[in-house]
Each structure stands twice: as structure tokens, then as C-alpha cells.
Amino acid sequence: MPKTLTEKLNAIKAAGKGIFVPYIMAGDHEKGLDGLAETIHFLEDLGVSAIEVGIPFSDPVADGPVIEEAGLRSLAHGTSTQALVETLKTIETEIPLVIMTYFNPLFQYGVENFVKDLADTAVKGLIIPDLPHEHANFVEPFLANTDIALIPLVSLTTGIERQKELIEGAEGFIYAVAINGVTGKSGNYRADLDKHLAQLHQVADIPVLTGFGVSSQADLERFNAVSDGVIVGSKIVKALHQGEPIQDFIRQAVAYQK
């Protein structure tokens, strides 16, 4: 039976709409983790498809400066993985949450305990950017009988056969990495990016979402045309932190029709 995240995103895709997933850093709020529910409900009210929730880490190798600084602010507020898990247990939302964490915080907490403790929460997906596919067995057995999907990240520099290997049996969605480098580096796209996205889309049997560097209306239109939707991180994190209006951008992303 498909996992909830797969079903919800497939339903949006079947309705001919673009999937939109904003990223937020847990604890990057003037109230720390006490403000997490407020941010989630703000995004839920705007109609987002799912929400990616980051766990702060002191050595975030895939994060650009905006998200790295958000993580440092969160850590300064005292955010810990344990405290986040306890907070997530109290949050009620109809929107699936996807945890984005490096492997070290997960390892320190204990993978089995982490998965068990999130069983009755809105968390339906898990992204671990520094976990190689060959080591997915460190995590996958603990997810097998749960409603949490392990989301594969696929670089578009990867050959088609390797792409097929990375996405085989995947649930939730495929995270297509649009740029070479860290998050937030908008516009640094390879010339044949659209072709590679279309190729990945053809071999995937679950939604393909494009992330890393997506930040403009033009990006939304471009990537919705060749994939099933987009993930936007740095632009959202910066706007929330600085109190900038972001509602119109999100509404445009949510309303995108295929």
C-alpha cells in the first residue's frame, strides 16, 4: 500500500496542479520551537502541498549561507532533535511534513527511536542529504513498516542507469537537485538541465520535485513544466526571518496549473 506522502502528492499531480513544498528551519523563530506550529499553520493556510522541516546541524554541508545561518539561529534558541520531536508530537496539521536532517543528529538520537517517536505525528517523509544510497540500509529497515518515506536525492549529473538505481522502490517523491553545489545558488543551472529533468521524470513512477536554487516566478514556471513541482528553501527562510511578505509568491506556486 502506498505511503501517505505518495498518495497525497500523486493526487495533486492527478489534478493537474504543480506540487509546492516550502522548506523551513525548525526553531528559526523568535519563539524558537514554540513558533513552529505557527509557521506550519501559516503555510498550511496558503495551501502548500507538504512542508520540509529542517533539523539544525553545526556542519550542514549541503546548505547555502541563508539556511546555514538559520540553523545557527535555531541552535542559539536551544533547538535539539529531542525537543523538536516532542514539539512535533503536539502539532496537528493535515499537511504532510518531511524532515530534512543530516545523518549525525539522526545517529545520535538513534534511528529506530527517531522513527518510533515520530510514528504518531504528521511526519510522512525523511530526507538525509549526506547518506549515500549504498548506506540507505542504515535507515530503510526501520521505515519499512511505517508511513514515513525515505526521499532519494538525485543529482542531474547522474547517468540514467544510476538514476534508475537511486529511485527504485522509492516512496513519497524524487528530489531532483537542480544545481551543482549548495542550496540557494539560484541561476547556476547547466545548459541541458531541462532535458535531464524530463528524462528523470520519464523513468520515475512517483512525483519528481526540483529543488536547490529555485527562487523566482520564472523558476516556478520552468521547473513545473519539466517536473511535477518545486521545493523552495532559501527564499522562504529568508522572508520568514526578515518579516518580508512571501504570501503572493506561495499563492502563485500553489495555484500553478499544468
Curated annotation (Swiss-Prot):
It catalyses: (1S,2R)-1-C-(indol-3-yl)glycerol 3-phosphate + L-serine = D-glyceraldehyde 3-phosphate + L-tryptophan + H2O. One of its GO terms (cellular component) is cytosol. Its EC number is 4.2.1.20. It is an enzyme of class 4 (lyase). It holds the Pfam family Trp_syntA. Keywords: Amino-acid biosynthesis, Aromatic amino acid biosynthesis, Lyase, Tryptophan biosynthesis. InterPro entries: Aldolase_TIM, RibuloseP-bd_barrel, Trp_synthase_alpha_AS, Trp_synthase_suA. The alpha subunit is responsible for the aldol cleavage of indoleglycerol phosphate to indole and glyceraldehyde 3-phosphate. This is Tryptophan synthase alpha chain. The lineage of its organism: Bacteria, Bacillati, Bacillota, Bacilli, Lactobacillales. The gene is trpA.
